[in-house]
């Protein structure tokens, strides 16, 4: 969950988020170096009085400023393409969760088990307990076992929604009549917050998501209690 005055990415909670943070740092390093170099060149040109009135062409410098940007783009594109393929890859999921967006709440179905489905509504401000987060707490949290490959299917019953957990680098659009999928792995036990990230009507801001990552044994006990 993003905290007050936090201007950076949220703490990583999945292997995919760790890869995305590494790519972010990689790209930012390149951008900062380019910014410093260009700024230094501009300042040096502004504050010196040297001039060259007979420069007609410069084959060498034109070659350099063509090749170097191409190399920089390749250095950014290669890890980006690798990440794009990794984000869409799902290998032998051990759990399937179907998520349905409504105006304005979420429905969850655990398709691997019988009769496990529930709705998740935001808890109104007046009904919050101590230490609950305003506009983020729900009446039914979504439990998942950590360190487990999970397949997520997202759709919508009315308008377009978007199921998003920033700390797990997951954002899936829920489109009526379509199923979008993604993989999810939590690398630690915790509670993760998210919100609908697609404007879906008057109460768009009141569709929080709470994912509770627990141990596999606790998850199995929860499944048995719901059966």
Curated annotation (Swiss-Prot):
* Enzyme class of the recorded protein, top EC level: translocase
Reactions this protein catalyses: 4 Fe(II)-[cytochrome c] + O2 + 8 H(+)(in) = 4 Fe(III)-[cytochrome c] + 2 H2O + 4 H(+)(out)
Q: Give UniProt keywords alphabetically.
A: Copper, Electron transport, Magnesium, Membrane, Metal-binding, Mitochondrion, Mitochondrion inner membrane, Respiratory chain, Translocase, Transmembrane, Transmembrane helix, Transport
Q: What is its main location?
A: mitochondrion
Transmembrane spans: 27-48, 63-82
Query: How many cofactors are bound and how?
Result: Binds a dinuclear copper A center per subunit.
Q: Could you tell me which Pfam families the record lists for this protein?
A: COX2, COX2_TM
For Cu cation A2, which residues are the binding ones?
Answer: 196, 198, 200, 204
Which residues point to the Mitochondrial matrix side? Answer: 49-62
Q: Name what cofactor the protein needs.
A: Cu cation
Tell me how this protein sits in the membrane. Answer: Multi-pass membrane protein
Biological processes, Gene Ontology terms: ATP synthesis coupled electron transport
The record's annotation in InterPro entries points to:
CcO_II, CcO_II-like_C, CcO_II_C, Copper_CuA, Cupredoxin, Cyt_c_oxidase_su2_TM_dom, Cyt_c_oxidase_su2_TM_sf
Which positions are annotated as binding Cu cation A1? 161, 196, 200, 207
Gene Ontology CC: mitochondrial inner membrane
The entry lists its GO molecular-function terms as:
copper ion binding; cytochrome-c oxidase activity
Per UniProt, where does Mg(2+) bind? 198
Write down the SUPFAM superfamilies for this protein, in alphabetical order. Cupredoxins, Cytochrome c oxidase subunit II-like, transmembrane region
Q: Give the domain of life.
A: Eukaryota
Q: Where does the UniProt annotation locate this protein?
A: Mitochondrion inner membrane
UniProt xrefs under Gene3D superfamilies: 1.10.287.90, Cupredoxins - blue copper proteins (2.60.40.420)
Mitochondrial intermembrane side of membrane? 1-26, 83-227
How the protein assembles, per its UniProt entry?
Answer: Component of the cytochrome c oxidase (complex IV, CIV), a multisubunit enzyme composed of a catalytic core of 3 subunits and several supernumerary subunits. The complex exists as a monomer or a dimer and forms supercomplexes (SCs) in the inner mitochondrial membrane with ubiquinol-cytochrome c oxidoreductase (cytochrome b-c1 complex, complex III, CIII).
| Its job | Component of the cytochrome c oxidase, the last enzyme in the mitochondrial electron transport chain which drives oxidative phosphorylation. The respiratory chain contains 3 multisubunit complexes succinate dehydrogenase (complex II, CII), ubiquinol-cytochrome c oxidoreductase (cytochrome b-c1 complex, complex III, CIII) and cytochrome c oxidase (complex IV, CIV), that cooperate to transfer electrons derived from NADH and succinate to molecular oxygen, creating an electrochemical gradient over the inner membrane that drives transmembrane transport and the ATP synthase.
Query: According to its UniProt record, which protein family does this protein belong to?
Result: Belongs to the cytochrome c oxidase subunit 2 family.
Q: What is this protein called?
A: Cytochrome c oxidase subunit 2
**What species does this protein belong to?**
Sitophilus granarius (Granary weevil)
